[in-house]
Amino acid sequence: VSLLADKMQLSCVNRSKPGSSNKEIWKKIMSSKHEPDDVIIIGWSFAERTMFKGKQFLVSNERKDVQLYYDRLYSSKDHAEDFALRVDHINSIHKCYNLCVDKRDLRKLSTWMTSKFLNVMWEDAEKLYPRARDGNHPIELAHKHYAETLHQCIVNEDYYKRPWRLI
């Protein structure tokens, strides 16, 4: 985010928290004060990451309470509609640039959703460069490439064209 802010000659306030669910992202933005000319860039999380009773988790978690949640309470259709509602809600109040972690998540969105997502994916930049010494994270060049691509998408208003389908 700071690389992009530098490129756009803006100051940067990064309020992200790794592992946040889309519900938590929505709550953080809604409870923060924003100026009318603020540039808000939202990196939405994985569709199935959720927050329940104040705890964050993903479907892949092996804890018993998490498995119970996904077995008994979770519905991918309901979750996609909830996500679309949160994105549209924020975008109806603020001018936002939306980013999605995975293009497959965009194919699951509700047909009534009006918000757009920039046509840039982190995974595309990540694939172009080797991993850092830890073997898990990409090297700095991947971040620079992503910031440059993101900047071009904002300047050119390049949004992902969703192949809509009913969910």
Question: Where do the language-model regions lie?
Answer:
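Alpha-helical cap/lid subdomain in secreted, periplasmic
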Residues: 30-167
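Serine-esterase "nucleophile elbow" of acetyl-processing enzymes
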Residues: 1-23, 33-34, 145, 153
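Short active-site-adjacent helix-start/loop capping segments
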Residues: 21-25, 48-51
